[in-house]
Each structure stands twice: as structure tokens, then as C-alpha cells.
Amino acid sequence: MSDLQNQMKQAVADAAVQQFRDGMVVGLGSGSTAALMIKGLGERLAAGQLSDIVGVTTSFQGEVLAAELGIPLRSLNAVDRIDLAIDGADEVDPAFQLIKGGGACHVQEKLVAARADRFIVVVDSTKLVERLNLGFLLPVEVLPGAWVQISQQLKAMGGDAELRMATRKAGPVVTDQGNLVLDVRFEGGIADPASLEKEINNIPGVLENGLFVNLADEVLVGQIDGGVASARSLEKAG
């Protein structure tokens, strides 16, 4: 990752932290940009700049980080509502449709985003695309005993699926739910995210896929302008 990209991530994470208010129940996302945001939230709480915040995390990694920083946490089942969720994305199209799941946390991420009154996505400018899936593969979480069958069904739908393998251990990536992840590429990208999200989730054995359709209320983008990193709110197409 380049130094410029790191600067963009930090700028947008700093902007995200400014969205939190006293007394909020907040969804804390996963990934590198979200981790910077969680650190910023912890710093503001420690400095007394925020109070009465309760966090709901979307991954084990985020839970550990938030706990280390002293952020009070509750499970999704223990809260009636989430005031604001902030998370990253792997790709964002002009209509604010997303691909998420590079960290294999998209099931919990989607649960938190759907529960939130407001969902803000934070990305650097490299994550903005005209069409989803031309660059980043679509993650699909599947039951371990059905991944071959599901791969075949995805192929019949025009998708080329491969089982995600772990890099620090032998064998496949295993999600927090104990499932496997198929990474899928559709020729020409994904023209209709809303239809495809439903079609994939209707395959028996699929728990959830990484298409986030009509969930994002705002997208904050980190950018470099004149050598200086800053964040801006993206204008939604249409």
C-alpha cells in the first residue's frame, strides 16, 4: 500500500470519527480504514471529547481492537437499534452499491449496516469504480458441505468461482460463522447488483454475498489534492 493511499485512508477515517455524537450506539466496521476510524474513536473517548458511546463490531478483529481501546461494546442481539454505522468497502459504484467482504466479514457487516439508522461508507479514491466486479471478486459465504455444488450453480449463472484459501495456514479461509468463502467473477462485471444479490442468496447453502444494495446513505472518500490528503462526501449518481 502506497504512502499516498495511507494518507487518504487516515483523512477519511478522521472525517468519519467526526460523525459520532454523545450517547450513540455505533456500528464499527472492518478493514484497514475502519480500523483507523476505531482508533480515532478510542482516542476521542479517552480524551473526554465523546461520552456514552456503545459500539457494535462487525468482526472479531474489530472487537479486539475496540476492547483494547476501552470502547464499550455490545453484541448485535443486545441492542434495539444502531444510530450510525461506519464501514469501509472494496468497491463503490456511482449509485452507492458496494462490494464488501475482502476480510470475509460481510455477513456481520451487512447485518449491522441493515440495522443502522444511517450507514456511512468510508473509502479512499482507489475504491471508486464505474461497475462492480470488474476488479474485485464478489465474496459469497457458503456452507462447507455445499461449496462445490454452489460453485457449479454460480457457473450456470455466468460466474467463475474459486474457493478462498488462507495465507497463514493450510486450507481455506474459515469465516467467524465457521463457513467458507467463494470469490466470484462475472464476465463484464455486475450490471444489476440488486437482482444478482437476491439470485445468489436464493441458492441453497449460501449464507450471504458481498453485494450491499441500497444500504449506503453517504460515501466519504479520501483523496489527494495538491499533495494534501482530505476527505469529501461523494455525490450519488441519479
From Swiss-Prot:
Active site: E109 (proton acceptor)
Entry EC no(s): 5.3.1.6
Annotated substrate binding sites: S30, G31, S32, T33, D87, G88, A89, D90, K100, G101, G102, G103, K127
Domain of life: Bacteria
Reactions it catalyzes: aldehydo-D-ribose 5-phosphate = D-ribulose 5-phosphate
Stored Gene3D superfamilies: 3.30.70.260, 3.40.50.1360
GO cellular component, one term: cytosol
Family: Belongs to the ribose 5-phosphate isomerase family.
HAMAP family the UniProt entry points to: Rib_5P_isom_A
GO biological process: D-ribose metabolic process; pentose-phosphate shunt, non-oxidative branch
Listed pathway(s): Carbohydrate degradation; pentose phosphate pathway; D-ribose 5-phosphate from D-ribulose 5-phosphate (non-oxidative stage): step 1/1
Molecular functions per Gene Ontology: ribose-5-phosphate isomerase activity
Subunit structure, as described in the record: Homodimer.
Function: Catalyzes the reversible conversion of ribose-5-phosphate to ribulose 5-phosphate.
Protein name listed in UniProt: Ribose-5-phosphate isomerase A
Species assigned in the record: Synechococcus sp. (strain WH7803)
Keywords: Isomerase
